[in-house]
């Protein structure tokens, strides 16, 4: 009888202890969740409302329905729908082209990373040193990288012009502005991919290479039929992360190609990305049309949600392709 009472008391104490630990765990888990709601969830709701309403950033109680003026301003050219002192639609479509162009270069960085990782996987002399050297650009500050490339590409005393013996204005010529941003990205981005691919190579079963060699496969066949399928999950992850980073390019573009006088995104806006356009609209949120109404915040919300949806859809497509390749 006493043994049963003691057992019941022990179980009750364990339940009480578990309940206390459970409550403590929930409290700890809710701390980052609360931060997410405040700093991500709330702005997300405000931006969604801002697509359809005029929102005053300094007074969120002042919200008025805008009859889809934000959508009209973004997608309809100036000659058809004139709201601002500049053609927002023209800037938007140019920013779309440049952003897609920059995002597509992630494929190049992926190929560069794969090529270098393949060479390093053969373990040449100094492989560890080269791996560190290739990774350094990735961990460098974006500000430092941007200043370095501005110094290299400067038309007056820049290293590139000194080597070529020319005086080309790389950072001011509309034909070369976007290429300056792309070159900087290709220089900085592959380091992370190299490390990831090196780890992926190590996880491939060596027995597969031995079996392929027994079957008479040459180096190319082993690479295509063994290595590529083995690193497919890593490739899809890097592609997904790279495309998202490309679509959200801002700091590198803004620092290498600052806004020109009377133009956003450098000369002829050839350094303008969608995120830079959003930043410009928010910074000029007090600018009004001929009726004294500002649609800048609404337009910024429209572009932000467009980027969000495009990035989400592309990520879902790549995720499904990754699952299919794993089957």
Which residues does each predicted region cover?
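A structural signal for multi-pass alpha-helical bundles of membrane permease subunits
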Residues: 16-327
